[in-house]
Amino acid sequence: MEHSSWHALIKAQLPEGYFGKINQFMEQVYSQGIIYPPKEKVFQALLTTLLEEVKVVILGQDPYHGPGQAQGLSFSVPDSIPAPPSLQNILKELSDDIGVKKSHDLTSWAEQGVLLLNACLTVPAGQANGHAGQIWEPFTDAVIQVVNHLDRPVVFVLWGAYARKKKALVTNPHHLIIESAHPSPLSVYRGFWGSKPFSKANAFLKETGQEPIDWLR
């Protein structure tokens, strides 16, 4: 992370010494038990999608908490792992909106400029939201603020009540916010189905002179 295009701008948004606190937190929790994703993948979203490449932000809450699932990108799992229910629903909506994506590893999206950011970057095994409110939210809020300050128009995709609260951080009128219910089985019928976020994002990118995302890659 220190050498990425994000580092200095995120640091400028945070209180003095906050990166040190994050390092201390990670040393502590990874030494005490099983934490996901693997330590080397905690910042994977920022390492895969450089600041100068961001076109779309898809905000998740926290990583998957089962073995082998979390890979540092919101909603994504390796193809060797069955797609969790929320991801199944995302891919079904994509299929209805644009077409079928055969892989449920979303790394190809990240490589095209889709920042797959969780608000909380770590989770204890088997404990959803187990690290919520401890260290990560100021950091990931800073990431959102850095993107908000870009002159280049960006699409923010906010699914569910938690992500939609982050709308307050997106104040730049150049950007587009696409919001709906969360793709989880509990809320998918409350407005996620039929929301067409993928075609809407691409229409906006084309309107603003940017290359659309190949969501099926």
Swiss-Prot record:
It catalyses: Hydrolyzes single-stranded DNA or mismatched double-stranded DNA and polynucleotides, releasing free uracil. The active site is at D62 (proton acceptor). The keyword DNA repair applies. Its EC number is 3.2.2.27. SUPFAM superfamilies: Uracil-DNA glycosylase-like. SMART domains: UDG, UreE_C. The keyword Cytoplasm applies. InterPro entries: UDG_fam1, Ura-DNA_Glyclase_AS, Uracil-DNA_glycosylase-like, Uracil-DNA_glycosylase-like_sf. It is found in: Cytoplasm. Keywords: Cytoplasm, DNA damage, DNA repair, Hydrolase. It is an enzyme of class 3 (hydrolase). Gene3D superfamilies: Uracil-DNA glycosylase-like domain. GO terms for cellular component: cytoplasm. PANTHER family: URACIL-DNA GLYCOSYLASE (PTHR11264:SF0). Excises uracil residues from the DNA which can arise as a result of misincorporation of dUMP residues by DNA polymerase or due to deamination of cytosine. NCBIfam families: PRK05254.1-1, PRK05254.1-2, PRK05254.1-4, PRK05254.1-5, ung. Belongs to the uracil-DNA glycosylase (UDG) superfamily. UNG family. HAMAP family: UDG. This is Uracil-DNA glycosylase.
